[in-house]
Amino acid sequence: LSDNTALVMTSPRSPFSVAVVPHPHPGPDQVVVRARAVAVNPFDRLIQTAGDIMTPFLRYPAVVGIDVAGEVTAIGADVTRFQLGDRVVGFAAGTDKTRNQAGEGAFQTFVVLLEHMTSPIPPSLSFEDAAVLPLGLATAASALFQSDYLALHAPSARAEARGQTLLVWGGSTSVGTNAVQLAVAAGYDVIATASPHNFALMRTLGATAVFDYRDPGVVHDVVSALRGRTAAGAIAIGPGSASPCIDILGASQGNRFVAMATPAASFDQVRAGRGHRRSLVPAIVRMAAGSVSLALRARRNKVVAKMIWGSTLVSNAVGPMIFQDFLPSALAQGRYAAAPRAEIVGTGLAAIPTALERQRRGVSATKLVVRV
């Protein structure tokens, strides 16, 4: 009998169930990790509620989940960076189109991770705190460093000042806290938006100026703050974030490119289960209308706006640049914070659906973590 259990979806839109699954074995460039903590993301919930549309390629039964931290229990033949027992955090790529393997989903006891998407963690960093990192970090890095997005310089321990300013709209989110830190580590100034109670967090992470995204005059204020500066572009995170970013860059000098981390319409009100499929239709209509509206707005402002897919760096040089070259030393030397704050909401795989539902209702500057 296998000693591996997983939170499984047996078909598109099916409920989650805990089941015994085969114990995974690593490929040549992979490690197996005994999961100790996982974090939940909106994308995990989206696969369950709208996966037959958003991830039609996914094979079932499926194991979702991306954020995982734990201990290495097996090593592939070509792996050189890890040893048995190493404490690591990694990006579980099982739901990426190029991987599409249940054994590589995070929501199970033993998880297969790609070596180049895995980082060692220092003794001072708990599994629970480390687990907040992978998807937020990967999505931010995809936006900032991929050549077909903002194409910023790589982060390093001693980055030279670039003389450019990045706008991070939604700075206290999982993606935002990582975008702020990565941009600063790459030598860029950062202007962020957040709720006032998160202003101190933004400054701690390195933002040079912070604005309240709910303030009616925020677009004017950010444009004024960018006057005399060269914009490095913007990353838009959260519902309604792309429009103000487009307007701001359209009135500023520099790179008029908005990397969008959030779709044009929310799927939060769509529930899992085939009986709820009709609730998808209004969300799809809103997304189509919102996408057209954003495209027209971007064209008027001579701005490029493009959605980020957070797992694309699995297949290009940005993945190892972040998880292999940058993150290990940045964490070990205290130059990079595991952000946002981890909130432990349960223990065991069966606690994950409750965590996903709580996340749907909204969190602020927090990532929900489940101990495994």
Predicted regions mapped to residue ranges:
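Terminal helix/beta-alpha structural elements that buttress the NAD(P)+-binding lobe
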Residues: 2-27, 34-75, 80-372
